Amino acid sequence: LQPSINGEDWPVFQHDNYRSALTSENLRAEVLEPAWVWQSPQPPQPAWSGPAKWDAYAGLRGLRSMRNYDPVFHVVSASGRVFFGSTVDDSVRCLDALTGETLWIHHTDGPVRISPTFHNNRIYFGSDDGVVRCVDADRGTLIWSFRPKPLERLILNNGRLIPFWPIRTGVLVRGGTAYFAASLLPWKESYLCAVDADTGKATGG
């Protein structure tokens, strides 16, 4: 977008915790022009690429993908910066919204498939390595991390070794609490987690 245009922050996926994908801003689309472009060295690596193989129970074939939630890098924006996770180099990036300059990169041990959350100048996100992280939005330094389940065996998924409980949800922050889930296989337990957004400690509720 043109650097001279100011807009409301878009701090979470689809704007807000209700996923409204709406903003009160009024912009004239016909005057918008690209100001810069950031290009990944490789295309995104979805967790479940291609269509569903088939429905064994109903005997159906030729189904569309049911888990196509990460075909692109979903972007959030706040305080003049752009943030997004990558399934290519297992990271979250922060770019200057006016220039596209990379301000910092925070690497993880697995793909970051869902857009991060900006809250109180912190960035919250999960990764396929089974860890949720909170980093400083200015510098990208780690504030806290939380793993719902101790690391045990790893399994092969999408050409990568990952734990049984990757974090493939966003992190919803509300009332001082960060909510997220860890799950993968239907025959293994799933975890819905609530931790203190400031400290990363489990709330016990």
Specify the residue positions occupied by each region the protein language model found:
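Aromatic (tryptophan-biased) beta-strands that constitute blades/sheets of beta-rich domains
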Residues: 1-76, 81-83, 91, 101-108, ...
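Repeat-blade elements of multi-bladed beta-propeller folds
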Residues: 10, 63-92, 106-133, 160-193
